[in-house]
Regions:
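Acidic/glycine-enriched connector segments
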Residues: 1-175
Length: 176
């Protein structure tokens, strides 16, 4: 089963590079690479996509999975929530997006019953330990994404890093 599961890891909006604000042409290109990576993983047999459901890359990735699912791709979304209510202090638009995505996830995994200092690390480990591939946006900034990508590498996951300037997908090069 693990061979058909892919997780996501990436930054919250405020940690994304300043040249990638949501709605910009550069952001749209990143989303295009994200959708391409999901389609590529689906073509390689991945059917289940795990999102950590945080603002930013996690939710953008979850929305992309749902969009591709609507287009007929045989994939589904699993929501891995650090703790119930983690979205309650977010901006209203992010709360709306979170609930829209959560309502369409076929599986929901609350990792902790309530907030605890280690709940996000536990969530990140849950994502990695159940997956064999990780699609991420990581450009070297320290924090939770750095931890998750390092852990995924140690666990032997295939890594598709959308922050790399040149992504090679078999014989296709996507160059910015």
């Amino acid at each position: 089963m693990k061979s058909s599961i892919c997780c996501f890891s990436g930054y919250r909006p405020e940690k994304m590079p300043p040249d990638l604000p949501e709605g910009s042409a550069a952001f749209d290109r990143m989303l295009q690479r994200l959708r391409w990576s999901i389609r590529r993983a689906s073509g390689a047999g991945y059917r289940h996509f795990l999102s950590g459901m945080s603002r930013g890359f996690d939710l953008w990735a979850a929305e992309a999975v749902l969009e591709l699912q609507e287009q007929g791709h045989a994939i589904d979304l699993w929501a891995v929530v650090a703790f119930p209510g983690m979205e309650q202090y977010w901006e209203p638009e992010w709360q709306r997006r979170y609930h829209a995505v959560l309502s369409r996830a076929v599986k929901k995994f609350p990792v902790s019953a309530k907030y605890a200092p280690e709940c996000y690390t536990l969530r990140d480990r849950f994502l990695v330990e159940r997956s064999s591939r990780c699609i991420c946006f990581f450009d070297g900034v320290p924090g939770g994404t750095a931890y998750t990508v390092r852990y995924a590498r140690r666990c032997g996951l295939l890594i598709d890093n959308l922050a790399e300037r040149q992504l090679c997908f078999d014989d296709l090069n996507i160059i910015e």
